[in-house]
Amino acid sequence: MDKKITGLKLFLLLFWQVSFAQQTILTDSNLPIMVISTDIDPATNSPIDIPDEPKVLATMQLIFRPDGARNYLTDITNDSFLNYNGRMGIELRGSSSQELDKKPYGFTTLLEDNDSNNNVSLLGMPSENDWVLNSLAYDPSMIRDYLSYTLASNMGNYAPRVKYIEVIVNDDYKGVYILTEKIKRDSDRVNLKKIDDEDTDFPEVTGGVHH
């Protein structure tokens, strides 16, 4: 019995050491670094977990040296290297991908009142408030979505603009994501006119739309 207990202790110790060794602590990167800190839950005095919905409030800093130099986590206190430093609402997105360790997120940039949308340009993309953090969890190469969106855009079709970034959530390094424009009607995204109630026939309505 003692040998079994000793063997179990040894296994747990080795498992803990391997797991600890596999944890990555990000200090710098040639990619922009997004740091997300959810608000503190007064009931637990700990950061709020990010749910499927609704969005929870958080603060986000996006570290990006405009000259293209390497980005450092210590730059988080230097306004000159912060592409964004403000409030956000964030939630999980996706379906089966939510079950993976590396989860996808959707977020809205907010004004300081924690309610009003804040249209901002992130990493040179047109100003908006709805964004996606694509975890690339089902694509080990981490290039499929980036390549398909970029090729479609270069061919003259609309496709979401994308930027590779590093993501840290509540001091936990999550890995490489692509910051992506959320697909929506907008002059800089899907540039479609809003349909009015009286728009029921061609040419206002096309493409097999039924009422």
Where are the language model's segments positioned?
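Bacterial Sec-dependent N-terminal signal peptides
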Residues: 1-23
